[in-house]
A protein has these predicted regions:
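Structured mid-to-C-terminal alpha-helical surface segments
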Residues: 1-181
Length: 181
């Protein structure tokens, strides 16, 4: 985390730098939001599809030990807020799991089941994350988030494990519908 000052205002900036990750369909140019009316700096960054793939892969690997509540919120927010091409998301998930030498799940990962999200410990972690992260707006409970992530990610994973193309598109908030954009 970097701390900068604009006058007397303290500004925190966090930058994650990754090496060796596979970015699908490729690096994306992003406009970094500005506080004042200056031109937005252009940065190279991950695609939303790669972000989802990496966070989902962590959910699969970490299993019950997962404490990364931000990953749940991030995937849910992305699925709620933008459309996705099924083939592109499938490519990103497949490439990330291959690169990280992780088998694709053949059944629902524990992180997306009641065995995970209904435990008091996970409920406490979720509430603490929302409070500490100062998450704004109405955010569902972890069980609802997990159910929506399941509806978003698992049809793609099912196609990958079956060796089939996933020729669907996602509208913001879902569900998947047949056809490509």
């Amino acid at each position: 985390t970097l701390v900068g000052f604009l006058g007397t205002a303290r500004i925190h900036l966090q930058i994650d730098v990754g090496f060796g990750d596979v970015i699908t369909p490729g690096v994306q140019e992003l406009d970094y939001p500005t506080l004042l009316e200056f031109d937005a700096p252009r940065l190279l960054g991950y695609t939303p599809e790669t972000t989802i793939a990496e966070k989902f892969q962590a959910m699969v690997v970490l299993d019950m030990a997962n404490t990364r509540m931000k990953d749940f919120l991030d995937i849910w927010l992305l699925a709620q807020g933008r459309p996705f091409s099924g083939p592109v998301l499938a490519d990103a998930i497949g490439a990330t799991f291959r690169r990280r030498a992780t088998d694709l799940p053949t059944r629902t990962p524990i992180a997306l089941t009641p065995a995970f999200h209904s435990t008091p410990v996970k409920h406490t972690q979720w509430r603490a994350y929302l409070r500490k992260g100062r998450v704004q707006g109405a955010v569902p409970e972890l069980d609802v988030i997990a159910s929506r992530i399941h509806a978003f990610v698992m049809p793609v994973v099912g196609s990958l494990t079956a060796g089939e193309e996933f020729l669907h598109r996602w509208r913001p908030g879902g569900p998947w519908v047949p056809g490509e954009d």
